[in-house]
Each structure stands twice: as C-alpha cells, then as structure tokens.
Amino acid sequence: MRRRIVTAAGLGLAFLLTSCGLLSPSDEAGPGPRHGRASSLPSARPVPVGQGSRAAGDFNGDGHPDLVLDSLLAPAGGHDDDPGIGIVYGSAHGLDPATRELLTPARNAAPTGETVPAAFDAETSCDLDRDGFTDLVVTTDPPYDGVGRPPVPVQLLFGSPRGLGPARAVTLRIPDRARIGNEWPDQPVCGDFDGDGAADLAVTTSGPRISYLRGPFTRGGAPRAAGAPVAVPGTALATTTPLSPPPDIDHDGADDLLVRSADPGRRARSRLALGGPQGPTRAGTAYPPGYAVAFGRFAAAGRGPAPLTAVTADTDGLLSVAGRPGTIRTGTGGAPTLAAADVTADGRTDLALGGTRPALLLGSPDGLSPTPHRLALPRLPGTGRPLATVIALTDFDGDHHADLVLLTRRGPTHDRVTVYPGGPSGLAARPTRSFTTADFAAAGLSAS
C-alpha cells in the first residue's frame, strides 16, 4: 500500500494544512512560530454553518468550495506520525484562512481495535450519501500481520453543516465478493461511473482489476451495491485534480475512470475505462506516457464547441495534446502536476502546470496556446530550486474565473501555499493569500 507525502491530483491532493493566513506575497516562509516568527495564520473563527449545496468540495454546505491540504510540515519537536489533514473553508470572497480545521488521526480517524492510525492521507472527495455536504475519502495504515487478506485502509469522513471537524471517520465496507487476492485496497477515486446521479467509488484490488462500489453510501460506510471485481486497462488509478469533475469523454452521462500502468508520481501510460450502466467496464482512449493527465476543451473549436480532450504532461512539462505526442514544450521542469479550468471566463479551458518553473497556458480559438505565462513563486529559505505543486484550479470566489492554488516547497522544512485569483487576462501576477503549512500544525486545535 503506497503512502503519499505530497499529492497533486488528487485529491488527490492533499497537503498537511496546518496554517492558513493572509500575508504579503513577499513575506518569507520562516521556520515557524516555534522559532520566534509570527504565525502566518489569522485568528481562527468558527466554520460557517451551511444548509447543504451542490458545489464540489463543499464540506460545510454553504455553497462555497473548500480546500484540502495534506502533507503538512510537522512542527518542530513533532513526532514522525502524520500531523493531519488541513481544511481551509471557502467564502463569498474566496478561501478564508481564518475558518480552518486540522483533522488528525487521534481525533478523526477510525481506530482498529485500540490502535489509532499513524498515517492519515486525503485521497478524493465527493458527496457519497447525497445529503448536500461533500465527504472526504482518506487512507490509513491499519495493523496487519501479513497473513491472509489485509484490512481495508480506506475511511470516509462525512461532511456536515459544521464541516468535517466534528466527524469521526468510518471504515469503507468492501464486500468480500468485490475483492480478489491479498493486495491492499488503495487509490480510491470518486465518480458517477454508472450515470445514475449518485457518487460511486473505484478502489484498486489485485492486478488489473478494481472494486467497483456503487453509491449512495450509508453513514456506516457501506455502498448501495458491489459485484465482482471489474477488469480495467491498467493496475493503478489516477484521480482528477481536486475540485475538478471526472471526465465524460463520450458524453453518455456516466463518468469515465482514468487508469495507469504505474502508481501516481511515476511516469506511465494511461487509458480510460469508460463508464456506463454497468460501471467503468469498457476500455477507452489510450494516452501517451507521462506523469499527469488533465481533461478539457483544448482542441481548436472549428464551427462548434471544442471536443473534450486530454493533455498529458511528461518530463519538463512536455505536453501531448489530444493524443499527439510532444505537442507543446513548456519548460516547467521536473515531473509536472496539472489542473484544467476556465481562468479567463471565455468558455475555453486553460491549463496550469506545476514544477520548478510553473506556468499557465491559455485556451484560444485555435486550441491551447503554446506560450507559457510564468508564475512568480514565493521566496523560501534554503538552497536548490523550489518545486511548486498544483493543489487546485477552481472558482473559489464566485466571479466565474478559476483561481489557482500552489504549494511551493524547498527542502523538507520550508513551504508556502499561495492563491492566485483568475481574471479576464489570466492569473494575477502576485498571490493574494500566502501561508506556510507548518503554522497550521503548530496551531493545533481549530475554532470549530
């Protein structure tokens, strides 16, 4: 069973959110309050009480998307255990670092007997029980003696009018008939893969097969139905970028599942398993090798709307668009991360790329522009080039322009989360929100 330290799409994405604050973009990320530096967090406020909504990633149901951060920097003197998962709640004016929560294994994970998990990783999110509050899917490390079939490490945290903080996770119930072999169930991915309007889960099992769990789910973690494992064209699953919907390439009303030949974070070929009434059972389009795939309307529009296509990012941000290898060279450096959304509100999909030189590519009537618009990174102590990971690209403030959230890290002790608002000409030149995750963990308790 893999354990992610920094994730991009994936949720997943997920980063250890320990501090969210409003800072000048030029402020440096120091070693944390424990070294005498003022916290980058504002004083915490209670999470707003919501009534339920249809917004993606809305854990408290107030109609505004929220942000999940995993892979937090541990405070000085901390132990090796996972410091937790951070949530920054949204508002009518965008992400509000004052309304935040720290989810920890001790407070929020389901124990196995008397054993509390040490690992607590955010994987994906969707409204599993159809109550209007987004739920968070996490993976843990339950005890296992190596004999027989391992326990299920996937847990569900259900959203509520007060968010995720009050929740105690439940273990996902995967019927024996839906498992095969003795591999850990892993890499959960949300999507409506049968087109019935309820969120389903796909989870890896042994070999090129998945456990396909049909929603909605009970508060006890049980799916509505689950049959025998489903064969898919790969051995690993790739989630979409957090707050991005799963693709429906063939427009049949059922989401499609992206399958890889190697775990996320490794260079691999990928292919779609097309959804339908029986779930993601049909092999679909194959994509060139790379590290990440994003979906959008990237091709030239012609006389009608541009078709939904894929972009695959390879080393140094070399992009293959609509299956054409090496179409665009972006020079973003390293193994890139991706997110696609409409930043300029012109009806075309734009593409954000993470790396050592992150950039935005704008959509146009002729397709995705090959000209990268570089993003200014925060100053961080240390040596070497900082690496920026795309956390999310979505409209957080309701102005119809997608906003970008980056996590920039230099070494194991310094990072900065930055928010770049979208606008008619692209992303803002400088971030309007900036904080280090080390403060989030150091702050400990939330104000919920």
Predicted features along the sequence, with ranges:
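Beta-propeller-forming repeat regions
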Residues: 2-448
